[in-house]
Amino acid sequence: LVLLGIRDQSQFPLIFYRENCADMALCEDDIDPAFIADAACVCATGTHLSHPRTEAAVLKALRLAREGGARTALDIDYRPNLWGVAGHGDGESRFVESQKVTAKLQSTLHLFDLIVGTEEEFHIAGGSTDTLEALKAVRTVSNATLVCKRGPMGAVVFPDEIPASLDDGESGEGFPIEVFNVLGAGDGFMAGLFRGWLRGEDWPTTLKYANACGAFAVSRHG
């Protein structure tokens, strides 16, 4: 359950109530090897690494995917209150430093072919509030392609080494739209990104899909 407020184009206070919710009841026994074997990609969310039971399920799914040749992706999706480092009323908060969260994320980053997050989400994954330093820290533990979302500025991709500037990555511009509701922006972005990535499109085209889907999501209510 989410209680969402909309103050203006930049403030969306919300309260998460996620006590004993269905997705956090996921366990290893729920992971069907046959289902994973039929998948082209397994995408995990960072939230499900926050609890030992769901983490075990995620790790099993990733192991099966990698053994079967499927691609693996991580949406860092860092929500401090869902990791227990912020209160229920801090649902709008996107970043709280936590060595515990950073260590947990870094212990799994090597399992992914693609890692996606905002600058703040890479800060928690990399253990630094300097975006480039955070990306470099992630690169030391993972060879994944890194996709950094930059809101209205679009997104930038780092397939290999991290350059001296964010602007030196493979960039995709955002779409100028009126923002109504930011909830669902990340899900929309991932959907567009997967459409291009899984079909072997080039990064400019893939980022155009991703940014367009994210823009559609935030430009309407509901």
Please state what every model-predicted region is.
Residues 33-36, 109, 140, 200:
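Alpha-helix termination/capping residues and helix-transition junctions
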Residues 41-137, 144, 152-155, 160:
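Conserved beta-alpha-beta core of the PfkB/ribokinase-like small-molecule kinase fold
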Residues 20-29, 94-99, 128, 172-174:
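Short gly/ser/thr-rich secondary-structure transition/capping motifs
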Residues 63-67, 100, 127-222:
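Conserved phosphate-binding/catalytic region of the ribokinase-like
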Residues 32, 105, 179:
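Acidic, amphipathic alpha-helical patches
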Residues 22, 46-50, 214, 219-220:
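Glycine-rich phosphate/pyrophosphate-binding beta-alpha loops
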Residues 1-46:
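Conserved N-terminal subdomain of the carbohydrate kinase-like
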